[in-house]
Every structure is written in C-alpha cells, then in structure tokens.
Curated annotation (Swiss-Prot):
Heme c binds at C15, C18, H19, M81. One of its GO terms (cellular component) is cytosol. One of its GO terms (biological process) is mitochondrial electron transport, cytochrome c to oxygen. This is Cytochrome c. The modification N-acetylglycine is found at G2. It comes from the Eukaryota. Keywords: Acetylation, Apoptosis, Electron transport, Heme, Iron, Metal-binding, Mitochondrion, Phosphoprotein, Respiratory chain, Transport. Electron carrier protein. The oxidized form of the cytochrome c heme group can accept an electron from the heme group of the cytochrome c1 subunit of cytochrome reductase. Cytochrome c then transfers this electron to the cytochrome oxidase complex, the final protein carrier in the mitochondrial electron-transport chain. Plays a role in apoptosis. Suppression of the anti-apoptotic members or activation of the pro-apoptotic members of the Bcl-2 family leads to altered mitochondrial membrane permeability resulting in release of cytochrome c into the cytosol. Binding of cytochrome c to Apaf-1 triggers the activation of caspase-9, which then accelerates apoptosis by activating other caspases. The modification Phosphotyrosine is found at Y49, Y98. It is found in: Mitochondrion intermembrane space. Belongs to the cytochrome c family. It holds the Pfam family Cytochrom_C. The modification N6-acetyllysine is found at K73, K100.
C-alpha cells in the first residue's frame, strides 16, 4: 500500500481545491469524501451528482479508486469531475492510502 504522507501532499496539490475529507466537511465543486470507502458512487448526502455517477453502481475501495483515479472520465463517462487523472500507479497508491485514513477519521 502507499505512503500516507506522500498521499496527503498529492491530495493537497491535486484534490483539495474541489474536495474535503473531514467528517462534516463542506461540499466544494466536488463532494466531501468522508466515508468514501464502502460507499457506492454518487451517494454523498447533499451533493448533486450526474446520472453517470449515480448509475455507475460500484462501491468505492482500493481497486475501484486505483482504476478511477487513473482516468476518471474513462471510468465514469459523463462525470463532471474535470480532473485528468494520475498516471503513476505509485502516486495513486499513495493518494488512496491517505484517503483511506483521512476519510475515516
């Protein structure tokens, strides 16, 4: 599994402009990610998702996030997430390690 501290830096640089992770955190352009692991796509309470996200029907976990974060628009065509993805598998693993910790505190 990845490095939590490196993952935190990646989150701050590439994700925090649109997402929060803390319990009770506000939705920004993207949804708050608290409780992400084990949740189905398009299910953060109070966030307005595209039909593509709601209908994808997968449960977020290490494997699904690894694939999604490489190329979000390929994994969920029609998502409104404009992020191009993270090509390096090691960086995705670091980010997922951080998300696993930060979205569960």
């Amino acid at each position: 599994m990845g490095d939590v501290e490196k993952g935190k830096k990646i989150f701050i640089m590439k994700c925090s402009q649109c997402h929060t992770v803390e319990k009770g955190g506000k939705h920004k352009t993207g949804p708050n990610l608290h409780g992400l692991f084990g949740r189905k796509t398009g299910q953060a309470p109070g966030y307005s998702y595209t039909a593509a996200n709601k209908n994808k029907g997968i449960t977020w976990g290490e494997d699904t996030l690894m694939e999604y974060l490489e190329n979000p628009k390929k994994y969920i065509p029609g998502t409104k997430m404009i992020f191009v993805g993270i090509k390096k598998k090691e960086e995705r693993a670091d980010l997922i390690a951080y998300l696993k910790k930060a979205t569960n505190e």
